[in-house]
Amino acid sequence: MKQFLNEQIEFYEVQKFKQKTLTVLVVVAAIFPLLFFIYGYYLQSVEHIPFGDKPLSNQGLLISIAISLIFAVGILVLFFSSKLETYITKSGIHVRLFPFMKFKTYSFDNIKRFNIREYSPILDYGGWGIRIGPAGRAFNVYGKVGIQLLFKDGARLLIGTQKPEDFYNALSKFCNQNEVHK
């Protein structure tokens, strides 16, 4: 367990990818190669029609099916187990996008100001996940509302949230109110 989990938690949120379009895209991209090789194996072994100009052997197609199956299962497990976790404790803001990154802690001392912000994941950051765009870095998996942090060094970080008011209020407990803007 992470050390900060022994502290009192002021805010906690878990978000998962919920966009239907993105889910369909990931599922299709993961399963298409598998279906492609299954179709090729069917053509070659059942219909006795060579699959392609330089066809693989049936054994080669079976190996391709096995590799495609492993790939599809891996991609789908990663996608459906992915989650953005955000904690606020007295030691800072703790964020991770599981299973792609460990918890990253942002100290309150380094935050110049913060605010609730609507954003476009695609236009502002090029999509969802761990992103870097013209507006800075972002951790987002769903929705279009987040907490925009401006650090004293000028860096920006947006953390997507479905609970912007709760996030903001928890953050307000630890940051200097004179430098914070809603």
Predicted regions and their residues:
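N-terminal membrane-targeting/pre-transmembrane regions
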Residues: 1-59, 166
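A membrane-cytosol interface segment of integral membrane proteins
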Residues: 5-7, 133-182
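Non-transmembrane, membrane-adjacent beta-strand/coil modules in membrane-associated proteins
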Residues: 14-16, 95-158
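A broad, low-specificity signal for short, low-complexity segments enriched in glycine/proline
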Residues: 46-58, 70-77, 107-122
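Glycine-centered small-residue hotspots that permit tight backbone geometry or close packing
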Residues: 48, 74, 128-129, 160
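Terminal domain-initiation and capping elements
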Residues: 62-63
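Short, solvent-exposed secondary-structure boundary motifs
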Residues: 67-79, 129-130, 136-141
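Conserved beta-hairpin
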Residues: 70-113
